Amino acid sequence: MDTLNFKYVFLGQSILRYQVPLEIFHIINSIYENKYPELKPANKQLVGKIEKEHSLFFNGEDSDKMIKHNYLPTNVLMWFESMFRHYLKFNRIKGYKLHFNSVWVNQMFEHEYNPVHVHQGTIYTGLSSVMILKLPESFGVEYSAAAAPQNGRLQMLGATNGQFANVDYQPNITERDFYIFPYDMRHCVYPFNGPGWRRTLAANMDVDYDPIRNRGVS
């Protein structure tokens, strides 16, 4: 078995998990905490059943839901772009144009949740993300099946199906995790119970590309 010569071929969408540099992590948390009274509520354009949803960056079309603004320094914006470019390079996507659309923070308390949803920006093709900024000490009591905890979990639901396919992903999240995935990948966050809060960030990057040109690229 050690001498097998094989090549791994993956058909489907990918999720990449990164670790946020401490400097970026602390800057984002500090901006959220210190600028909180100034931050614009993002609830009108989000599906989450969450009271505290606030925007740090928006570069889409002005509307009654949101207008352009930015609370993030250049080095943080550049870091986000570099991560999205890495995802596209890893997935061998060529000939694309980027437009950084939005960044917001969800601070969830017990019983709040994010139902199954997808993302979009100015266009329908692009990459979204989840960054773990703060976690409570515990997600509370699991009232059944404690060996398979669900409280507070992030769940990604892939579009791939068929025999032997991995159809969902539910990571053991830790602070400084950063997950990048396509706009149309369904995902959700389950509620938790007990004290504390769960603070996460989402960032949307529009990716204008030709799927025909990129078909079968290797």
Predicted segments, located by residue:
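Non-heme Fe(II)/2-oxoglutarate
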Residues: 1-94, 111-114
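Double-stranded beta-helix
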Residues: 204-218
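A short alpha/beta connector and helix-capping loop motif
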Residues: 195-205
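Residues at beta-strand starts and edge strands
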Residues: 12-14, 99-101, 125-127, 197-199
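Catalytic core of non-heme Fe(II) oxygenases with the double-stranded beta-helix
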Residues: 106-180, 188, 196-197, 211-215
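A short coil-to-beta-strand element that immediately follows conserved catalytic motifs
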Residues: 93-103
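Short beta-strand segments enriched in hydrophobic/aromatic residues
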Residues: 133, 185, 205-207
